[in-house]
């Protein structure tokens, strides 16, 4: 009997960034929240993000609607 892998509906910030191929950065996630590109909820001390926002941000990056740039170790999210 084969077992199915259960994919969680919500992910941590680390899993979110890993899915996009980015390093886990608190400032990056705060900028995405400030620009209202992602919503989150808290469980204890953890911020959890719905998995659907990974696809949304990834599509916006591919379409050139947003850019993520670095300058001296800081990450910036720029909307076009």
Where would I find each of the regions flagged by the language model?
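Major-groove DNA-recognition helix of helix-turn-helix-type DNA-binding domains
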Residues: 19-51
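A short, Lys/Arg-enriched interface patch at domain edges and termini
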Residues: 52-80
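Detector for methionine-enriched segments
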Residues: 1, 29-30, 60, 79
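Low-complexity, intrinsically disordered short peptide segments enriched in small/polar/basic residues
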Residues: 3-4, 35, 40, 51-54, ...
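Polyanion-binding surface elements
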Residues: 1-28
């Amino acid at each position: 009997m084969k077992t199915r892998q259960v994919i969680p509906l919500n992910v941590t910030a680390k899993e979110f960034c890993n899915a996009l191929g980015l390093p886990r950065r608190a400032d990056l996630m705060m900028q995405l929240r400030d620009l209202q590109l992602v919503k989150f909820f808290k469980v204890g001390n953890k911020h959890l993000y719905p998995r659907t926002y990974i696809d949304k941000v990834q599509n916006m990056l591919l379409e050139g609607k947003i850019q993520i740039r670095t300058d001296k170790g800081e990450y910036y999210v720029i909307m076009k």
